[in-house]
A protein has these predicted regions:
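Active-site-proximal beta-strand/loop segments in catalytic clefts of secreted hydrolases
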Residues: 1, 10-15, 35, 51-58, ...
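Active-site-adjacent substrate-binding region
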Residues: 2-34
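Active-site-adjacent mobile loop/cap segments within catalytic or ligand-binding domains
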Residues: 24-91
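Pro/Thr/Ser/Gly-rich low-complexity, intrinsically disordered linker/stalk tracts
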Residues: 83-127, 162, 176-197
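Short beta-strand elements bearing conserved aromatic residues within extracellular beta-rich modules
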Residues: 131-135
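Short beta-strand segments within Ig-like beta-sandwich modules, predominantly Fibronectin type-III
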Residues: 145-152
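Beta-strand-rich modules
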Residues: 156-179
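Aromatic-Pro/Gly-enriched surface loop or interdomain linker
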Residues: 184-273
């Protein structure tokens, strides 16, 4: 129980400190409960039950529907577990790097393919910088081969086979582990390449966002007819367009849930960001 209390305190402190630094300096810190909830009491390992947002609180949901916020909270939860374990075993915690950015490929001398990228520093964690990188390479529609370790922020593929599309992902690594993978880039050389001009494809779309917010008098909600937002990767949570924007609309039953009610036309869909 004492370990649970320590883990809960570390987790709450980490989340609140990070959210105050990145989103709202007045983010409220609530009390920690010590209750006999079986999910946290019965397992013979430290555990906490985390309640961060309320779906009935419009201000909370403006954060909760933002994929950037969700990533940051998830990282805070991971960091708190790293802090807890480090304290238990008496070592200095090192936090895994953030995913790299600005991934690109280019042809260089003698038909070699160069992949380069930039590290992303974490302003909240001074020791989260990458010490090295793992480059993953796949051919055509095949799976990724085991990664190749490099110290610099570039990698050169020497042997290029004509007619094959090479796909790349990169992850940063340090003593704390491996970052989440980067986006994927690809390049290939068609047969008879000396007669074919080089074509460069630029991925100019890197936006992720919550849906548009509607606040006008007593009308509040998420106006996806103006901006649906963009998921980070894939989204399983979006079930359909909101149709009840009246904040005074009461809950009657599950078929008439009142303010915030939405259609369920997309319940089975996985949306790509």
């Amino acid at each position: 129980r004492v370990a649970n209390r320590d883990l809960g305190d570390i987790m709450q402190t980490t989340i609140v400190d990070d959210l105050r630094a990145k989103y709202d300096p007045n983010w409220n810190r609530r009390a920690i409960w010590d209750r006999d909830y079986s999910e946290a009491v019965r397992p013979n390992v430290p555990g906490v039950l985390l309640e961060l947002l309320s779906h009935q609180n419009f201000a909370d949901m403006k954060f909760g529907l933002d994929p950037r916020f969700r990533f940051d909270v998830a990282r805070s939860v991971y960091k708190s577990m790293a802090y807890f374990l480090a304290d238990q075993h008496g070592y200095e915690p090192v936090i895994q790097p953030l995913p790299v950015s600005h991934l690109r490929t280019e042809w260089i001398d003698s038909g070699k393919l160069k992949v380069s990228w930039e590290a992303v520093m974490d302003p909240l964690e001074s020791n989260a910088a990458p010490d090295a990188y793992v480059v993953y390479v796949a051919r055509d529609e095949g799976s990724y081969a085991p990664g190749q370790w490099v110290r610099e922020n570039h990698f050169v593929l020497d042997e290029i086979e004509a007619g094959v599309v090479y796909r790349f992902r990169v992850a940063g690594v340090n003593a704390g582990g491996e970052s989440m993978p980067s986006e994927e880039v690809a390049a290939g050389q068609p047969f008879g390449a000396q007669e074919v001009p080089t074509v460069m494809v630029i991925a100019g779309f890197d936006r992720i966002s919550a849906p548009a917010v509607l606040e006008y008098g007593s009308f509040r909600g998420f106006a996806d007819f103006e901006d649906e937002g963009v998921a980070d990767g894939m989204d399983l949570s979006y079930v359909g367009r909101q149709y009840d924007f009246d904040s005074q609309s009461p809950w009657l039953d599950d078929d008439a849930p009142g303010h915030g009610a939405s259609y369920s036309t997309l319940e089975t869909q996985v949306l790509t960001g």
